[in-house]
Amino acid sequence: ATRPWKCCDRAICTKSFPPMCRCMDMVEQCAATCKKCGPATSDSSRRVCEDXY
């Protein structure tokens, strides 16, 4: 899968084909290409992009 962001250190993917992935990186601000940006569960001051790709 092609990810819509430059950096994704913590990707979680399903075992389906093609796999669906989410990037679990905690960032200060989501990338402009992120459609759904939410607060990180472990640190509410950080953000996580909730888009699947």
Swiss-Prot record:
CDD domains given in the database record: BBI
Alphabetical UniProt keywords: Disulfide bond, Protease inhibitor, Serine protease inhibitor
An annotated Gene Ontology molecular function: serine-type endopeptidase inhibitor activity
Superkingdom as given in the UniProt entry: Eukaryota
Record bears the keyword Disulfide bond: yes
Site residues (Reactive bond), renumbered to this chain: K15, S16, T41, S42
Protein name: Bowman-Birk type proteinase inhibitor II-4
